[in-house]
Amino acid sequence: MVRLLQPKHMVQAVNALHWRNSVEFHKLLKDNGDFSICFNSEQVLPQKISVEKMVKMLPRHLIAVVMTPNKDGKSRYILCGIRLLQTLCDLTPRNAKLEQVLLDDVKLSAQMIDLVILVIIALGRNRKESCNSNKESLLEATLVASCLHLFHGFISPNSQDLVLVLLAHPRVDVFIDSAFGAVLNVVISLKAKLLYRQTDSPKKLGASSVEEVNFHCQQAEAALQFLHSLCQHKPFRERVAKNKELCGKGGVLRLAQSILSLTITPEFVGATVTIASTSRMKAKVLSILQHLFEAESVSFLDEVANAGNLHLAKTVASEVLKLLRLGLSKASMATASPDYPMGFVLLNAMRLADVLTDDSNFRSFFTEHFSMVLSAVFCLSHGDFLSMLCSSDLSSREDDANVDYDLFKSAGWILSVFSSSGQSVTPQFKLSLQNNLTMSSYAHQRTSLFIKMIANLHCFVPNVCQEQDRNRFIQNVMSGLRKDPSSILIKMLPGSSYTPVAQRGTGVCRNLGSLLRHAESLIPSSLNEEDFLLLRVFCDQLQPLIHSEFEESQVQVKVKKLFALLYIGFTILWLICLVTLIQDIEGRGGNLSGKLKELLNLNNEEASEDCDVRVEGVMTKQGVNEEIDTVERLKESDADASNLETSGSDTSSNRGKGLVEEGELVQNMSKRFKGSASGEVKEDEKSETFLVFEKQKKKRKRSIMNADQMGMIEKALAEEPDLQRNSASRQLWADKISQKGSEVITSSQLKNWLNNRKAKLARANKQTGPAHDNNSSGDLPESPGDENTWQQKPSTPIKDQTVTETPKTGENLMRTSSSSEEGIKQGQQVRLMDERGDEIGKGTVLRTDGEWNGLSLETRQICVVDVMELSESYDGSKKMIPYGSDDVGRTFTEANSRFGVMRVAWDVNKLQY
């Protein structure tokens, strides 16, 4: 039996021999044939020690040191012992006797496993929120990485063999929890150090500071790399997924959150090494999460949800979304130097997102946020879109690498920092590239993962998904297409990389078609047929919405430009005519002021019936203004008639027909104005022009009900005034009146007709006073396009007319105060009312015309109001607003968050002023 050494002899041997590398150790053993070694200690005389005794005693000795209370130098001494053990393990292939003593002894191997597990438990027991001093944090990071990699030295460099040994150990669950905790502590101290460096000026950062940051980052990467290698094997990751401490209490998620949130600035020299190292760490932790989420024995995410830590998982999902935005923004750009591989960050983020989008806990989160990223990608120019997702030969790709960790060098560097001998050169570890993917395979995987995420979010499972989420994803994509794509993706691409707004509809549809064709070529090698079919359904549903959205907006823009040009042209024409008139009067020596007053008096009783005051064939300002006003009224009338005419079944053919007719109308108007300016228009031509207006009105008006049907509804309203709100009764009357006409009247069409009737009665009350019979429409036209809009001024001048005024009663006074010839004006104070007539709040009118977030204010008879205060009975966070959307908000509180004020669109007939 070998006699064991005394502890003091072991301490001397460890302190003296850990500086010797395996080559030097081998030479010392050869010089002494009795399997002993001489070393110089603090004593004057050299000492000789039996290697066999030292090897058998060393693991037990270090375990005893670990179990002792904390004292100065304890961590450094343990690291010295770990370093010496690694040197002995490296020497075993060249020394058979040492191999027999160190590796073949089962009991000794078990002691070494216990040693590593105890050290890791001690390092990972307490979760840190802040780091120790700079040197202590570096020492702890090195000790964690060294202990984990010592397993490869005395068990096997193959991680599969290591998994089998660890799973057979009785304390494997405690080790797994402590190992993740120890790595988390290393990352937390690194994160604190990086945040501190960001506040430093670059001039204050010396070479030593940069080296320390790089060294710390490499130790953290090496420790995480060890855990990642174990999680590559199914038995180990299944054991991790079952660990309640890691899964239920969120240990793995905290580690992932800490790593994914690492941020550094490239201001200091050598940052490239650190940037690449942190990026590879993010890629590895994403891969670990993906493996754990796909565990078969237990649902990792369900365990997290049951433990009440789903908020941690959503924080990680948010970081994944940031990586997707950044990665897709850089996907078509050149990557960093090949000397510093960044890891498969984008690819692993997409793999993890594929898992999360298929989970009910995260479906709504990615539907809300990833749809915005998706729409921005679809807005890329066709060339950039093809190079990113529809190509097998990419201009750039991600590269992955593993650190060839050198335990002896790492421990030696940090120990030299504490010794009086001074600091040595920081070790730079070699990187072994792990690119087992060809360029085409990488490109196909990236495209297939992109398609799988679309398929997961667009797929509707009735038993799992809520009914309100049926079309939510595609609606969010449409909402994203209306936004600026550069505000969604990280602003790294030039503006030319995106399709112009005027061509967005065509460009997005073209990109969708290219993606479909390329996806079909990936079946079945990279993409399954089910995901492809879901992509096709998504494209088939999205393209009609795109055509409807962007073609209609383009038509509106063109019509607006046309009317703006007409207005400018008519104004210039009138000014030219006015200048010519003034010059002519001055040339004749006439009274300029008197004649101008006579000619330009718009309310002159001797003016012609159509108010076209002409002097030598020149049309004055009033004639021009009335013509323009007529065109505007026709435009509004056409829009209203189109709304009633379609009743939810508007078609592109009807819109196209309307455009042709408007074009003919504008041509006739243009001819008339040209003729009026030159004095060449005759009375019969003038009459013919107005016949064109009447013809346009009659052509566009299409009554959905005949006189008998309207009579039936009027009688029904007399008996049941609330018919508009009673859906069952409304459906019954729709069926009844359908039997009296040539067309089938639906309940929604009848409701639309009743709404229009109610609006006309309200406008008639404003302009002519209250109707005598509330249930009779009188001579009100059916279509809202057949009467002037709510903002129209009275067409007949009332000044200088002799009329008999009716004394104003209290009712008349109230009506006069709440309406005017001008209608609602910008800046006017108003009260907002609900359907029951109750006051909701008070505000100021912001806009009354034009468009606001896709709403035509004149056509829909609405205006934009800034609400200053809400009634006490209403909760702004719960009260839904009309015309709500993702862009403007759906409640008063959401509107306030969008604009900084509660800005809403409100029906004019529900405003009091």
Curated annotation (Swiss-Prot):
Protein's UniProt keywords contain Lyase: no
Disordered, as annotated region: 635-657, 762-830
Domain of life: Eukaryota
InterPro entries linked to this entry: HD, HTH_NDX, NDX, NDX_C
Ranges of the DNA-binding region feature: 698-765
PROSITE patterns: HOMEOBOX_2
Keywords: DNA-binding, Flowering, Homeobox, Nucleus
Bias (Polar residues) ranges: 643-655, 765-778, 786-829
Example of a GO biological process term: seed germination
Cellular component annotations (GO), alphabetically ordered: nucleolus; nucleus
Cell location: Nucleus; Nucleus, Nucleolus
Functional note: Regulates COOLAIR, a set of antisense transcripts originating from the 3' end of FLOWERING LOCUS C (FLC). Associates with single-stranded DNA that is part of an RNA-DNA hybrid, or R-loop, that covers the COOLAIR promoter. R-loop stabilization mediated by NDX inhibits COOLAIR transcription, which in turn modifies FLC expression.
UniProt-recorded name of the protein: Nodulin homeobox
Organism name: Arabidopsis thaliana (Mouse-ear cress)
Recorded name of the encoding gene: NDX
